[in-house]
Amino acid sequence: MASSVSLGSAGPADDLALKVTPPRVPRHLVGRPRLLASDERYRDRPVILVQAPAGFGKTSLLAQWRLEHLAQGAVVAWLSAHPQHDRPRFLQSLALAVAVGAARPTFGHTLLDGAVPPGLEGVTIWLAELAQTALDVVLIVDEADRLPTDAREALAYLLRNAPPNLRTIVAARADCALDVDD
C-alpha cells in the first residue's frame, strides 16, 4: 500500500508534487526562434503573459523557456495551476515549486506546514522569503485561467509586489482575468 506525505492539515503532498513537476520537452518540437526567452522583447520583463486559446502550444513554449532559463543559471519554479488551488493551496504550491526548483527543501516551510495566514498575508510572507534568498527565480505558472478567483487575486498581488529577483511567466487562455497594472 502506498503512503503519502501530509502537509499539515491541508492534505496529501502528492497532488502538489505533480503540479510543480514541469513537463518534458519533446525532441521533435519545432523551435520558434522569434519566441526565444532570450529575445530582447522578453529578456528584462518582470512579468510575461502568454495568452492563446487551448492547443496553441503555450505549455510547450513555457517548457522551452524553462530550459533556456536553466541554461542561463536561473532557478526555475514551475506550477501547473488547478481549479482546486484555492488561495491556501496555491500558496503551498508556490512554496513547493520554489523548494523543488531551487533544491531548498526548507523554503516556504511555514506555508507547507499548513499555517497559511488569511487574506494576502501569505503571499507577502512568500515574497519576503523569496526576496531574502540570493537566487534569481523565474516562476512559471501554466494554465492560470484554471485558478479560482481568490488564487487569481493572490497571483495578481504577487505580480504587483514581486521583488527584483523574481521574474514571472504566466500562461492562460484568452479568458484569464488578472488585475495587474501594465
Over which residues does each language-model region extend?
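Conserved ATPase-coupling elements of RecA-like P-loop NTPase cores
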Residues: R146-L155, V180
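Walker A (P-loop) ATP-phosphate-binding motif of ABC ATPase nucleotide-binding domains
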Residues: V47
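Short regulatory helix/loop adjacent to the ATP-binding pocket of P-loop NTPases
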Residues: A174-D182
